[in-house]
Amino acid sequence: KIGGCSQFAFLPKMKIIFMDYMAIADEYKKNSIFYPFFSMLMLYFNDTGLDNSYFITEIGAQNNDKYVDHDSAFLRKVLAMENFSIIDSPYFQPCLGNNKIGSNIDAHLYLKTSAPLNKLSKELFLKLLREILYEHYDSWYKIMLSNSEYKEYHQYIVNEYERIESAITLNDKIELIDCVSS
């Protein structure tokens, strides 16, 4: 019996390990099982010698965090124990293809770095964002959609990137918020 699964992507330009998805059967959603599973994943990436600088994931934050589902709240606790921080900036989870336009949701990016940080420059944040949106989401759909569908999806990614970019002023330093205190 399968108890769970996870999906990760390695984005080599910025050396990002991006956690796309993690699912665990209901009977295993306990601290005593979920946390060791997550820790094993973290150890796996460490033991493989994969040269990474950033570990990033996203968690939905609908209506200013008023509607965080139980699983997301639990994952947030686990990320706090693993010393992740919340990137305090506008973000959204992109649509899951062209036919699911309503699937994009407000979200937060959660970040763990190889070196301690408490703020990100706008430039670094935008590099990380570009890598996630273009090298991960956009490139995924480039091979999954027809040419015309991909052009539409690509333009959607461009528009959303520009929307987030314009929401951050040039001199902004983006705070990294402790998961525990937020």
Tell me what each language-model feature is.
Residues 2-3, 37-40, 88-94:
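Short amphipathic alpha-helical surface micro-motifs
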Residues 1-26:
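A conserved beta-strand-loop-helix scaffold within acyl/acetyltransferase catalytic domains
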Residues 14-17, 32-36, 40, 70-77:
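Short, well-structured alpha-helical interface segments that form or flank functional binding sites
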Residues 13-15, 29, 64, 117:
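Generic "edge-of-domain/loop-turn" microfeature
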Residues 51-182:
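Terminal substrate-recognition subdomain of acyl/acetyltransferases
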Residues 9-12, 47, 100:
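Generic marker of residues within folded, mature protein domains
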Residues 1-8, 48-59:
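Short N-terminal helix-initiation segments at or just after the protein's N-terminus
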